A protein has these predicted regions:
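Residue-level detector of alpha-helical recognition elements and their boundaries
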Residues: 26, 77, 190-191
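Non-catalytic accessory segments flanking enzyme active sites
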Residues: 1-41, 45-46
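Short amphipathic alpha-helical segments with coiled-coil-like heptad repeat character
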Residues: 17-20, 70, 183-187
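Tryptophan-centered motif/residue detector
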Residues: 16, 20, 88, 124-127, ...
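Rieske [2Fe-2S] iron-sulfur-binding domain
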Residues: 29-134, 140-152
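Short Pro/Gly-enriched beta-strand edge/turn motifs at strand-loop
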Residues: 17-29, 99-105, 288-292
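A broad, structural surface signal
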Residues: 9, 13, 17, 60-67, ...
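C-terminal catalytic domain of Rieske-type non-heme iron oxygenases
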Residues: 49, 54, 120-122, 127-299
Length: 299
């Protein structure tokens, strides 16, 4: 499952070409004629914001000779995408609007068969989702209960502060596996043990999606971890979340609740809306996996 090309082909045929995929963020397409590109398998995908402010997804290839249309990861067109091969021009809605020597095309350059191939595309909660499957089920139905869970965070009202790409020389599932359990914490992240409970973890399954809830701000219950003394990493976590460890009179078991109260208390001052979140969500990691490969550490 991790090294077989035959199994990879099965994944392509039954997963990647059938489901909803995350294409980017709504804030990447703030204005009409903005665009981004993304890749899945051997395909390049073009996602645009039309003059009507609708987001659309297309195969990023000119319909004439299959040349890559948009060469950059993101940008803004004046009015059209211009193919660098024969100068065919498409607007942000995927319509072919001009081609040299139009009289040589008996069907006319405005024929629908010459427009870019459009893919299902929807915006949701600050995300832009697309699918290679023209018959994909509605996004709301595909997300199931995870949709309402994640909408509570109002991602669409947040601003991106860092965007980083790290390439791993491994099968994609090796990465996803690592973000679907806390069994590895002791071996890989022992420095986290004084402020993260790696054992009392709630796991919820929602059809093809899942989440697990990891208590933060409390020591691991493993026998070698002090349950009373506030360790150095717990001190840092407390400071990050509005609790001064120098003034705190409680022990390590009481820090998590103090963090939750501090977050509520300073929410208005910081401009945070926690009205849809419970207290545990203010301290813990509500970790979601949107099938098959999107993981979210919401804390």
């Amino acid at each position: 499952r991790y090294t077989s090309k035959e199994f990879m082909k099965l994944e392509w045929d039954h997963i990647w070409t059938k489901i909803w995929l995350r294409g980017g963020l709504t804030q990447d397409l703030k204005e009409a004629n903005d665009y981004i590109t993304t890749e899945i398998g051997n395909y390049s995908i073009l996602i645009t914001r039309g003059e009507d402010m609708k987001a659309r997804a297309f195969y990023n290839v000119c319909k004439h000779r299959g040349n890559t249309l948009a060469q950059q990861k993101m940008g803004k067109i004046d009015k059209t995408f211009k193919c660098s091969y024969h100068r065919w021009q498409y607007d942000a809605a995927g319509q072919l609007v001009d081609a040299p020597d139009p009289h040589t095309f008996p069907q006319g350059v405005c024929d629908p068969s010459l427009h870019l191939t459009e893919l299902p595309c929807e915006e949701w909660n600050g995300w832009i989702m697309y699918s290679l499957n023209p018959d994909v089920r509605p996004l709301d139905e595909w997300l199931g209960p995870v949709k309402a869970h994640l909408e509570a965070y109002n991602f669409d009202k947040m601003d991106l502060v860092m965007d980083m790409t790290v390439e791993w020389n491994c099968n994609w599932k090796a990465s996803v596996d690592a973000f679907n359990e806390t069994y590895h914490v002791w071996g890989t992240h022992p420095q986290l043990m004084d402020w993260l409970d790696d054992q009392n973890v709630q796991i919820d399954l929602y059809d093809i999606h899942n989440r697990y809830l990891v208590p933060f701000g409390v020591p691991s219950p493993r026998p070698h971890i002090d349950q009373e003394v506030i360790g150095p990493n717990l001190e840092v976590y407390m400071e990050q979340n509005g609790v001064d460890p120098k003034d705190f009179k409680g022990n390590a078991q009481e820090a998590r609740r103090a963090i939750q109260l501090a977050q509520r208390e300073r929410a208005d001052e910081m401009g945070w809306d926690f009205s849809n979140l419970n207290d545990d969500q203010l301290s813990d990691d509500y970790h979601y996996c949107v099938f098959p490969n999107v993981t979210l550490n919401t804390h």
